Swiss-Prot record:
This is Putative glutamate--cysteine ligase 2. InterPro entries: GCL_type2/YbdK_subfam, GCS2, Gln_synth/guanido_kin_cat_dom, YbdK. It comes from Bordetella pertussis (strain Tohama I / ATCC BAA-589 / NCTC 13251). Belongs to the glutamate--cysteine ligase type 2 family. YbdK subfamily. Residues 392-413 are annotated as: Disordered. ATP-dependent carboxylate-amine ligase which exhibits weak glutamate--cysteine ligase activity.
Length: 413
């Protein structure tokens, strides 16, 4: 069995990756413009932190390593501004959000790299449907054994990350009734899911991966689309379930939450095997109903996820004070409990403007840090008619009376 070296990292360090949407500033449909944007940034100092993604309507923005989320936020704001300036130069918009509200997967162009071309050949249409946008949070750990313990400790909190970050209620022009529909695309891949419960240390992780490779089920760790996975070449644990938020501020708040939670779970006893029994159900509840899903705790109690999350914020408050991140966690807590997640905000925008292209326009404004400006629906219709391929079929799931149902996923519990 081949040993996998694990690069040691300082505990509690953190970094993030954000997968971002590139949109046409007239129609607000996705734009296959990653090559042009990357060329525009080629001579800029942040060039090595902006990467192509599986389709040409996406790019990935990578932070450096930070000890404190405040430094992360300063860097992400600077990179956001540079990215938006470059995007303006090539005539494209940039936005967050976990899924584009009305894109057609059939129209996506695969990026011209060997790995992405291989994925397109291997997975067929799933590769184009994988035009979804996530935030990955990296947490530094000193060893492979520590990484496996961290994955196991964080796994019961996967629903909390999903609900906090959910920003993908719409897909192909309809309200999916999910807070997070993005993970339905991720879960189509054969090695999606969670780390097996019997992987309890780095040796067992190496053995598990070796077995997958020997069976032809995987070629490397990159093929493990787990919700949380070790990243040995970085010396991190990577949380992969978050939708890309609508702002860099929310992205860094989520990173601060992850950092405090990682410190707490390192102090806690390891969850029992029973914690894995409800994993898939908890995952579904968070995707479908967001903050108002139900949650089965590691000891088997069924509660509302929002109530468990409220208690978790209280539990993490002393840890956040130790880390100097109390204000960021308090802001996240207050905004989430008062206003809900980004999925709820997006549905609220649709109720105001009744046009999904206008919703995307407001997403792009939010990403720039400009706030939302009112744009008459007639203006976006003029922009759509001006394009060569007008957007059609934009609608929301509705009642027999024709009233949209954007609140189902927030009201059922």
């Amino acid at each position: 069995m081949e040993q996998i070296p694990f690069v040691s990292s300082a505990p509690n360090t953190l970094g993030i990756e954000l997968e971002l949407q590139l949109v046409d500033p007239r129609s607000f449909d996705l734009a296959a413009a990653s090559d042009e944007l990357l060329a525009q940034l080629a001579n800029h100092p942040i060039a090595d932190r902006v990467k192509p993604e599986i389709t040409r309507s996406m790019i990935e923005l990578n932070s450096s390593v930070h000890e404190h989320p405040a430094g992360l936020l300063a860097e992400m704001r600077e990179m956001r501004d540079v990215l938006c300036e470059a995007a303006d130069a090539v005539g494209v918009g940039v936005t967050g959000g976990g899924a584009h509200p009305f894109m057609r997967w059939q129209d996506r162009a695969i990026s011209d790299t060997p790995r992405f071309q291989y994925l397109a050949e291997m997975y067929g249409y799933l590769a184009r449907q994988f035009t979804v946008f996530g935030q990955h949070i990296h947490l530094g750990v000193p060893s492979g054994d520590a990484a496996v313990r961290m994955v196991r400790g964080l796994s019961p909190y996967v629903p909390h990350f999903i609900a906090l970050s959910a920003a993908s209620p719409y897909c192909e022009g309809v309200d999916t009734l999910f807070s997070c529909c993005r993970l339905n695309a991720v879960n189509s891949f054969p090695l999606a899911g969670h780390m097996p419960a019997d992987v309890t240390d780095w040796y067992r992780f190496e053995a598990h991966l070796a077995q997958l490779c020997a069976s032809g089920l995987a070629e490397s760790i990159k093929d493990l689309y787990w919700d949380i996975r070790p990243k040995p070449e970085y010396g991190t644990v990577e949380i992969r379930v978050c939708d890309t938020p609508l702002t860099v501020e929310r992205a860094c708040q989520l990173a601060a939450f992850a950092q405090a939670l990682a410190v707490q779970v390192a102090r806690d006893p390891e969850p029992s095997q029973q914690a894995w029994l409800a994993y898939r159900s908890n995952h579904f509840q968070a995707c479908r109903f967001g903050l108002h899903g139900s949650y089965v705790t590691p000891d088997g109690q069924r509660v509302r996820l929002v109530d468990h999350l409220r208690a978790l914020f209280e539990r993490l408050a002393p840890v956040a004070e130790e880390l100097g991140t109390g204000d960021m966690l308090q802001t996240l807590r207050d905004e989430i409990l008062r206003n809900g997640n980004d999925a709820r905000w997006l549905r609220g925008q649709f109720l105001k403007v009744r046009e999904l292209p206008l919703v995307v326009e407001s997403m792009a404004q939010n990403w720039r840090g400009q706030g939302v400006q009112d744009t008459p629906p007639s203006a976006v219709r003029r922009r759509i008619r001006a394009t060569s391929e007008p957007v059609g079929g934009v609608c929301a799931l509705s009642t027999p009376q024709g009233d949209p149902l954007p609140g189902w996923a927030e009201r059922l519990h």
